[in-house]
Amino acid sequence: MNSLTIVTGLLDGDPNLALSAESILPAVKAGKATWLIKNSSSSITGNLLDYLNISGVKIIAESDSSLYGALNQALKHIDDGYFMIIGAGDTLSTGAVDFIHATLDSNPNLDGFYFAIQMAKSGNILLPRPSELGHRMACPHPGAVLSISKVKTLGGFDERYQIAADYDLLCRYVAAFGASGWSDQVVVNYLGGGISDFRMIEGFLEEELIRTRVCKSKQIEVCVRGLHFLGNTAIQLRRLGHG
């Protein structure tokens, strides 16, 4: 069985961490996964800290200036095998870790695997299509299970991107090692509500820059799509009475 590390990065704790723990700890207790929690402070205390005080859970409290900085620091503590990133409040679906292990074990030559995720609030399922990453965020990052050694050769997350560093890493990973494999099986229920939901325009522009730099999109296409996005956003705001 391949080594699997679940990584959660926090800037200053998160009340939703307990929700994630309920779905992750059974796999940890069964020896099927390790949970690495990278927090920029010592804010995980009390009953939650006691709850997490088991073998297989590692909490690292170090100062970080950004979420992707925290995740890069976390990756340094993983020696081998595969990892996936679960945000605070995200939960593993029933049997997810067993399915991930079975998939990896039956595909030993793949450098990574991409699974579907389900939006917790809407119930919508996002299916992975790594070959389409050059055009859109076609592999939701919570469903990506990647080789830690391969990610380290790429230098981890590019912290110059504040919103879309996850998309950048996936694009570079597929460009370097191929599309690998994917499954429409849901492994993560995604809570949402992260920074990309509140800074959509910045995220869009970062993604376009990534497509230009990594995926070799044409600059004129970037400009046109950016203008279309801004125009459509203005129309929606007017309809909502904000302009």
PLM feature spans:
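Short aromatic/hydrophobic "clamp" motif used to bind/position activated sugar donors
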Residues: F83
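A conserved acidic beta->alpha catalytic loop
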Residues: I37-L48, G87
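Short, well-formed alpha-helical segments that are part of the catalytic scaffolds
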Residues: D12-A27
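Short beta-strand/loop segment that forms part of the nucleotide-sugar
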Residues: A21, G31-S41, K58-S63
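Cell-envelope/extracellular polymer assembly enzymes that use nucleotide-activated donors
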Residues: N2-T5, D168
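Glycine-rich, basic loop-to-helix element that forms the pyrophosphate-binding segment
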Residues: A61-I78
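Conserved donor NDP-sugar-binding/catalytic core segment of glycosyltransferases
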Residues: T91-I125
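Conserved nucleotide-sugar donor-binding catalytic segment
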Residues: L127-I210
